[in-house]
């Protein structure tokens, strides 16, 4: 009997030790997979969970862009990501440029890419979404990766995503939150937001900016004002720049701009007045030190991850084909970039990393609001909508 009890005790001790080791291993694995708060999308190189895994290589990936090509902006970051992936894993990268900004011209470029022998065609934006809606099932051996849109009819009355297509929509409100929190933490309490059009993606930047500003203001016991205006055009002009200048001269300390080339206007306005600005979508900090940062979508990181997912399976599978994915904190695909050296003072890089992790793990909560008629309560931020 004593021997039997001793055996049971020994087994219990061994089980306890094994459980401890398993817990330690799980904890270590979790630490290894923690997402690091991104500060520069341009330097990202995708690292798979299994570094020993290999891809077959040899296939072609084609990026189709608007007439602006791959020289700057969002398409430049997508192109960088595609090239990085192709060079790392042995694929071929190519690009097609649409002749103009219409859906017909986008469709012609998409068809040329499909007929070039591409395994996967990458594109971005609503014009490409309208073009893809028409022809997404015409080439059964070609797959598509669409950013910032979903296949839709020209009048947006109908949507349909074929099984050959995977869509990625970024959570702009998350990037906006980072910017609003940083601005108020750094002492900017008279804020502005100027958007090109009052459409869901741009509005989400604004409402995220508002929620971040509210969180920081509440923490610091500050009261903040935020005035908003939508220009109804993606093209900056002298009148828009002058309105920015007037805002700064009348006490606005920092303006966030979103859409089109409004960043050109705010760059001129801050240089004339000494005000500060934050831009969106991609890194514009090269415009000067008065552009404190950019609330960005990490196109480079996102496209590399999507390409790896696609080529690892050889297709869009049941979880990806015909589906739309929302990219954001979870995979480190939105960010606040703030130059080198870091341009915020009170809001340090350590503060940024802590904030990012708290948002990623839902320690801090935020919501997506796609219109300005339904806003969260913000007792510390007064919103003034201008026409």
Say what each PLM segment does:
Residues 1-9:
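Positively charged n-region of N-terminal signal peptides that target proteins for export
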Residues 7, 24-25:
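Extreme N-terminal leader/targeting regions
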Residues 15-19:
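C-terminal motif of bacterial Sec signal peptides marking the signal peptidase cleavage site
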Residues 22, 29-387:
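A residue-level marker of the well-folded mature domains of exported/periplasmic proteins
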